[in-house]
Amino acid sequence: MAASTSAQNAMTSSPYSMFGLGEMASGLYGQNTSMAGVTVGMREGMLMNIENPAGLTALDSCKLFAEASAFVKNERYRSDGSSSNAFTGNFSAFSLGGRIMRRWYMSAGVTPYSFVGYYFKSSQELEGSPGTFVTSTFSGTGGLSKAFLSQGFLLTKHLSVGMNLNFIFGNMTQNEIQSAMTVSREMSGRSFYADFGLQYHRPIARETFLTVGAIYGYKQRISLKNTVTVTGSSTEPPYNQKRVTQYLPQYIGIGSSLAHKKWTYALDYLFRQYGVLNSGDSRVKFRDSHELRLGVCYFPNGFSSS
């Protein structure tokens, strides 16, 4: 089998985004991205840490923060001797945050949750007909977005907790063309869910601060309205609509950071239960992921750690 791919989406060009809910967004922006994605134990006076909302309690209480993010990435894929390159980029997130009351901090915004964006062709020889090939074309666009309301509470001088209230929504379109037949699948879904964070933070020496944190997000069911339209076939019904059940994966993370003067060092461990996702193809299975992240930051003017 031979295949070729090319980008048709500004958010991703990955053929893997045709499975499940698409290619999952990292959820990391700004300083978190530049430090290899560490978030669990991060808290700074100018950092809106929505991955661990307990970190919001470190925000400068005299300021209102606004953050907009964009990204660019270069991807290369190979399949049976052929390869493709894609350079993509787009606006990715927007958020606002600051202190509401003495011990209460809040942030709100919109970020991507998953991306669907692919276009490729596959040619396969017909059994019993040497030299005769059937070409199938696959394409997809769309994805899910996340609107969030994050809240952080400073329970004591050294202990903070936080919670993200999230609304997942979006549409995905997938098309498969083979000879004269076209199968179009349109999926739309929405779901509410919450995730939680905890941080213990204290100075351990002069100009040296230690933070230990944890985050947790539970497995959440999401119902997708799945509409399938078939054209060019006399044997299949032209239209079918049904509900498909999918899941937002459970995850748990622990991490810590050490801030000393202008330097910050951080380490995270994250477990994500991707095995609960349904790929939509019996040949494709998702596996749980384990991530270990290590980040170092040098800030010339220094952050006001707390």
Model-derived regions, located:
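Transmembrane beta-strand segments of Gram-negative outer membrane beta-barrel proteins
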Residues: S14-T39, T57-N74
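Short, charged, low-hydrophobicity "junction" segments
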Residues: A2, A36-L47, G143, L155
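Sec/Tat signal peptide C-region and signal peptidase I cleavage site
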Residues: A3-A7
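Surface-exposed loop/turn and secondary-structure junction residues enriched for glycine/proline
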Residues: G27, V38, R43, P53, ...
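Outer-membrane beta-barrel translocator/receptor signature
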Residues: M42-K121
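Outer-membrane beta-barrel porins/channels
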Residues: Q8-S34, G81, S95-S306
